[in-house]
Amino acid sequence: MANYFNTLNLRQQLAQLGKCRFMGRDEFADGASYLQGKKVVIVGCGAQGLNQGLNMRDSGLDISYALRKEAIAEKRASWRKATENGFKVGTYEELIPQADLVVNLTPDKQHSDVVRSVQPLMKDGAALGYSHGFNIVEVGEQIRKDITVVMVAPKCPGTEVREEYKRGFGVPTLIAVHPENDPKGEGMAIAKAWAAATGGHRAGVLESSFVAEVKSDLMGEQTILCGMLQAGSLLCFDKLVAEGTDPAYAEKLIQFGWETITEALKQGGITLMMDRLSNPAKLRAYALSEQLKEIMAPLFQKHMDDIISGEFSSGMMADWANDDKKLLTWREETGKTAFETAPQFEGKIGEQEYFDKGVLMIAMVKAGVELAFETMVDSGIIEESAYYESLHELPLIANTIARKRLYEMNVVISDTAEYGNYLFSYACVPLLKPFMAELQPGDLGSAIPEGAVDNAQLRDVNDAIRSHAIEQVGKKLRGYMTDMKRIAVAG
């Protein structure tokens, strides 16, 4: 099979990369009704599979789970989760032939095997759904022409999809229809109903394309969302310890620092995160972030280039064929790093202390978010898509590190994200070592003293922070979410 994106001509590539439209709430007036009375069969019962299924059932849809015979016979975790939550469970042969919509929510590396197994069983005119388009775009999976292919991609982990639904809201979601597979022209109606059934329409839905979702998703997770956090954790910990900081304190400052810092990012973007610093610290964080952007820009661009060309995907799929040798080696090496094996600090670190003593970490977040966003936009991805795949998801990933360090992050994210994370972090750590050697007192582990600042310089820095394109689009999208949550709660 050929990489689907690479079969398109340049005009088609640019059109699909640039497809992104924020959909109005009125476009979801019919809710999930288009799928009511139809049979929806989910393949896979992991975090997305289970939690999307719970939401869809609560929205009035007929949901069941198709699992492999071995998973049922051996009563594996997927079988237990589905049955314990009261769902009908059966084999592919038992459930797929009756399905109007088959939703493939298995890991990326299983998609080809799953699709080859279920496609011959699907009835004429059925629909096939994904929550990530890797199999269609990068693998180039060929789907029968009578089958409609759609995507609903919540921009949050599965647990968050469920919790927000239970609160009467939802999570921002991308939806798309594969242009090669919409024989009856009903793809958008199916995708909208599925998104509404998960609650996504209450938080904001972007009409996108399989191509735009895949290319932006890969870029975000490899760079700022996972790769930058991993590289930053390892570099900052080693720097602190080398300068005499207690390893336990250093570990806690970093492990929980990312979450604390990005919570401000979540509420008010880079502007609010930077506003949590004193004026001297803000000026220093800005200067550091500009240095970091200059150093890391070629690395970010290389990742984007390799994603666009398909070089990244072909390399990762070669590792799949080699029993994940690279992935497993990198995972083992990460587990042995000094940061991962450091003792726990039993003392308390106050919220403001994370900001005051984490100026470098804030600079890394700012630089990484802006670089990821800028690089995606320069490659033809629309700003709204770039925002969701950079700034929006960062607090969610930072939260996984707060739970069990890098181990937890790499367990929670997909194998695709984990592989890309290692590619980036293994290149980024040595790239930034000379920069780390030139840091000043107050950049990390101690606070920058209060002092006079130049008013004109502070004004210009504040203007530069607030006028960045990601701050403009972020303010708009966060406003949509706030307004929609207010409407949802009131309703």
Curated annotation (Swiss-Prot):
Concerning its family, UniProt says: Belongs to the ketol-acid reductoisomerase family.
Gene Ontology biological process: isoleucine biosynthetic process; L-valine biosynthetic process
Example GO CC term: the record gives: cytosol
Looking at the Swiss-Prot or TrEMBL record, what is one Pfam family this protein matches? KARI_C
> Organism source for this protein?
Salmonella typhi
SUPFAM superfamilies registered for this protein in UniProt: 6-phosphogluconate dehydrogenase C-terminal domain-like (SSF48179), NAD(P)-binding Rossmann-fold domains (SSF51735)
**Binding-site positions, Mg(2+) 1:** D217, E221
Show the stretches that span the lipid bilayer.
none
Q: Which GO terms describe its molecular function?
A: ketol-acid reductoisomerase activity; magnesium ion binding
Catalysed reactions, as listed in the record = (2R)-2,3-dihydroxy-3-methylbutanoate + NADP(+) = (2S)-2-acetolactate + NADPH + H(+); (2R,3R)-2,3-dihydroxy-3-methylpentanoate + NADP(+) = (S)-2-ethyl-2-hydroxy-3-oxobutanoate + NADPH + H(+)
NCBIfam families per the UniProt record, alphabetical = ilvC, PRK05225.1
Metabolic or biological pathway, per its Swiss-Prot or TrEMBL entry: Amino-acid biosynthesis; L-isoleucine biosynthesis; L-isoleucine from 2-oxobutanoate: step 2/4; Amino-acid biosynthesis; L-valine biosynthesis; L-valine from pyruvate: step 2/4
Annotated function:
Involved in the biosynthesis of branched-chain amino acids (BCAA). Catalyzes an alkyl-migration followed by a ketol-acid reduction of (S)-2-acetolactate (S2AL) to yield (R)-2,3-dihydroxy-isovalerate. In the isomerase reaction, S2AL is rearranged via a Mg-dependent methyl migration to produce 3-hydroxy-3-methyl-2-ketobutyrate (HMKB). In the reductase reaction, this 2-ketoacid undergoes a metal-dependent reduction by NADPH to yield (R)-2,3-dihydroxy-isovalerate.
Entry keyword annotation includes Magnesium: yes
Q: Does the keyword Isomerase apply?
A: no
Q: Which PANTHER family match?
A: KETOL-ACID REDUCTOISOMERASE, MITOCHONDRIAL (PTHR21371:SF1)
Gene3D superfamilies listed in its UniProt record: N-(1-d-carboxylethyl)-l-norvaline Dehydrogenase, domain 2, NAD(P)-binding Rossmann-like Domain
What is the name of this protein? Ketol-acid reductoisomerase (NADP(+))
Cofactor(s), names only, from the UniProt record: Mg(2+)
Keywords, in A-Z order? Amino-acid biosynthesis, Branched-chain amino acid biosynthesis, Magnesium, Metal-binding, NADP, Oxidoreductase, Repeat
